[in-house]
Design a protein with these regions (language model features):
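Structural preference for solvent-exposed beta-strand-turn elements
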Residues: 1-423
Length: 423
């Protein structure tokens, strides 16, 4: 796929996809808890489809109605599930399969198998779950003989480990106490877990390093509206404040969202961006225009996805960007730290990495030619595409379909902003 833009004629309206952080949690919990559910709207991103395939493997019935999914039926332990490259579905499923007492083989993408899983496995092993890892890096797990009374989980590497244990404990017991070790990274994602569980009648309340999880009710059916994804919206909002004199409208977002990445609106506004919620409509849309920005600082430990989107400001906004704790970006879908450094240097930016801080500032203005983006990481591809358009260059995206992991319509939406896209 080839894309090009002139860097100044960006305008239009785009719609963001559903929050896969919410949708995956709700889909998986509905299936494993045998709760009849209607969930949507969905973008049917790769990660959402993986969650749907997992519960289908567990015997649940799925009926698609437009961009909604109806879930019903009885759960049965699957012999095999494929988690693809979805870290969220993989980690949550390990906990839920354990709570259901299943003996299941896991398979998936080799890159996901290489990502850390140890703290979650250790936590579940304390409860009696047995894991045997295969040559492909994924386990066969046996939870037939488990005693799930004492829950301890290290949350210092991934909040998804904590999410998995919260969901497992709520499925196994009416009341559980979970001890969370270490400083939890990306804590805002746990708020999404708490809200998701609340939809199923479960209260997850944190006090210090402990969670108390209590079942309050057992709804026969749940109706769940999935809000738009701020992680995906971030790159469009940054695109707008860097390159749209006429402004762009980003639709589908919830104004009072608990998504941690919703802070992107405040971050950009505090940096001087012309960005605001449209109060004249009822569709919860944001309008943003090209602005002179101040330096932006973002903590990759807390906002890893925002760090990718905001790295573009370091290339095109003179005050630049500071990314704190950038090493966190190395353990995502790819080595994202290396990827954004290479992206910035391609445009002549000054890049400095030391003392747990990555600084990016524009250097000699450069309009590179013959850009080839060979990353398979959805977040990197979207950032690279926006950088190409902002620079007025032309570039070749080698694996454009990979954006389907989170934002299947990304390139169609980009076309709406006067970016030339040639499949």
């Amino acid at each position: 796929m080839r894309i090009s833009g002139n860097g100044s004629d960006i305008s239009g309206t785009v719609t963001v996809p559903s929050s896969k952080s919410f949708s995956q949690r709700c889909i998986l919990y509905a299936g494993f808890s045998e709760t009849e559910a209607r969930i949507g709207p969905l973008a049917f991103s790769n990660d959402e489809n993986i969650a749907l395939d997992i519960i289908k493997s567990c015997g649940l019935n799925l009926v698609i109605s437009g961009d909604y999914i109806e879930i019903s039926g009885k759960f049965s332990c699957p012999d095999l599930i494929n988690v693809g490259e979805s870290g969220t579905s993989y980690r949550i499923s390990l906990g839920l399969l354990s709570a259901r007492g299943c003996r299941t083989e896991i398979t998936g993408d080799r890159l996901l198998a290489a990502r850390p899983i140890g703290p979650l496995v250790e936590s579940l092993e304390r409860c009696g779950v047995r894991f045997e890892f295969k040559p492909d890096g994924f386990p066969v797990m046996d939870a037939a003989e488990t005693i799930m009374e004492e829950w301890v989980i290290d949350g210092s590497l991934s909040s998804q480990y904590v999410t998995s244990v919260l969901m497992a404990s709520s499925l196994k017991n009416d009341r559980s106490v979970i001890h969370v070790l270490g400083r939890t990274v990306s804590p805002d994602y746990l708020k999404i877990t708490e809200e998701s569980l609340d939809l199923f009648g479960i209260a997850a309340e944190r006090s210090g390093n402990y969670y108390t999880v209590t079942r309050r009710s057992r709804p026969e059916k749940v109706y769940i509206e999935i809000e738009g994804d701020f992680s995906s919206a971030a790159v469009m909002l940054v695109f707008g404040v860097l390159g749209s004199a006429d402004g762009i409208r980003v639709r589908g977002l919830k104004r009072r969202s608990i998504q941690g990445d919703s802070v992107i609106v405040k971050m950009l506004a505090d940096a001087g961006a012309d960005i605001s919620w449209d109060t004249d409509t009822n569709d919860d849309s944001i309008i943003c225009r090209k602005s002179d920005l101040k330096k932006i600082t973002v903590d990759a430990d807390r906002y890893p996805d925002l760090a990718i989107a905001l790295s573009i400001t370091g290339i095109f906004s003179p005050p630049g960007v500071e990314i704190l704790n950038p090493e966190r970006l190395r353990i995502k879908e790819s080595d994202r730290l290396d990827a954004i450094i290479k992206m910035a240097e391609r445009y002549g930016s000054h890049v400095e990495l030391r003392d747990k801080i990555l600084k990016i500032q524009p250097g000699e203005e450069r309009k590179p030619s013959d850009i080839t983006v060979d990353s398979k990481d959805h977040r990197i591809i979207m950032a690279e595409a926006c950088a190409i358009a902002l620079s007025g260059s032309t570039g070749f995206i080698k694996f454009p379909h990979e954006v389907s992991k989170s934002y299947p319509a990304f390139f169609w939406e980009l076309e709406k902003l006067s970016v030339k896209v040639i499949p």
